């Protein structure tokens, strides 16, 4: 009883899979050139990736902060560092060392 049922299911599965393999893909599926891009589009992607990747780490390269040296000076002064926690770095630096 089980063997004929199993054979029938296998035959049905074979017919379904064979029918799907023989069928030609439709226009939406074929997507002429969907796996490929033009040279111009490809070079734009590569340029974009090169611009934003750090070559050693493979991660986006951070933009240098122009205020980082001043922030370190303020952090080394305990009074400036404490004031920066309350009113912000730029205002604390201005009060201790002059304009930013």
From Swiss-Prot:
The record's subcellular location field reads: Secreted
Q: Hey, what's the signal peptide range on this chain?
A: 1-23
PTM annotation (4-hydroxyproline): residues: 60
Binding-site list for Ca(2+) 1: 68
Is Calcium one of the keywords UniProt gives this record? Answer: yes
Record-level GO BP terms? biomineral tissue development; bone development; brain development; cellular response to insulin stimulus; cognition; glucose homeostasis; learning or memory; negative regulation of bone development
Reported modifications of this chain? Gamma-carboxyglutamate residues are formed by vitamin K dependent carboxylation by GGCX. These residues are essential for the binding of calcium. Decarboxylation promotes the hormone activity.
Record-level Gene Ontology MF annotations:
calcium ion binding; hormone activity; hydroxyapatite binding; structural constituent of bone
Main localization of the protein? secreted
Q: What keywords appear on the UniProt entry?
A: Biomineralization, Calcium, Cleavage on pair of basic residues, Disulfide bond, Gamma-carboxyglutamic acid, Hormone, Hydroxylation, Metal-binding, Secreted, Signal
**Binding positions (Ca(2+) 3):** 75, 81
Protein residues bound to Ca(2+) 2: 72, 75
Q: Which stretches make up the Gla domain?
A: 52-98
- Which positions does the record annotate as the modified residue 4-carboxyglutamate? 68, 72, 75
Q: Which InterPro entries match?
A: GLA-like_dom_SF, GLA_domain, Osteocalcin, Osteocalcin/MGP
| Cystine crosslinks | 74-80
- Propeptide feature ranges: 24-51
Provide GO CC annotations from the record.
cytoplasm; extracellular region
UniProt lists the family membership as follows:
Belongs to the osteocalcin/matrix Gla protein family.
Q: What does this protein do?
A: The carboxylated form is one of the main organic components of the bone matrix, which constitutes 1-2% of the total bone protein. It acts as a negative regulator of bone formation and is required to limit bone formation without impairing bone resorption or mineralization. The carboxylated form binds strongly to apatite and calcium. The uncarboxylated form acts as a hormone secreted by osteoblasts, which regulates different cellular processes, such as energy metabolism, male fertility and brain development. Regulates of energy metabolism by acting as a hormone favoring pancreatic beta-cell proliferation, insulin secretion and sensitivity and energy expenditure.
Q: Indicate what this protein is called per its UniProt record.
A: Osteocalcin
| Gene name linked to the record | BGLAP
């Amino acid at each position: 009883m089980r063997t004929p049922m199993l054979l029938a299911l296998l035959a049905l599965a074979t017919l379904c899979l064979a029918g799907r393999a023989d069928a030609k893909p439709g226009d939406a599926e074929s997507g002429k050139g969907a796996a490929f891009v033009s040279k111009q589009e490809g070079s734009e992607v590569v340029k974009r990736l090169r611009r934003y990747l750090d070559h050693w780490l493979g991660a986006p390269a951070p933009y240098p902060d122009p205020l980082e040296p001043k922030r370190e000076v303020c952090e080394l002064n305990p009074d400036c560092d404490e004031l920066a926690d309350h009113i912000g770095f730029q205002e604390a630096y201005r009060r201790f060392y002059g304009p930013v």
